């Protein structure tokens, strides 16, 4: 989860390395944080006019609003992590085994 980008909907992406948390905007404290961020110019609205379903908290103090549910965003992050693990370079030992067996490891 250190590099790459997360699709937050409507062809909008955010750097995974900058994400602190993904929360539902339904609670009063989160709504207050969103209001303050808007007043301070630290709010990015990526909902394209749709209902806000997730608030993404970033390292720089920005809050990014998304129309995608937090659970969906987290599952996209997990899928990306799994894909990175599958595409990691194989070790020398695994390469030798692959050559011997003629199969993918």
Curated annotation (Swiss-Prot):
Region feature Disordered, mapped onto this chain: 76-105
Superkingdom as given in the UniProt entry: Bacteria
Pfam families for the chain: RemA-like
Compositional bias segments (type: Acidic residues): 78-105
Entry similarity comment: Belongs to the RemA family.
Protein name listed in UniProt: Putative regulatory protein COPRO5265_1186
Organism: Coprothermobacter proteolyticus (strain ATCC 35245 / DSM 5265 / OCM 4 / BT)
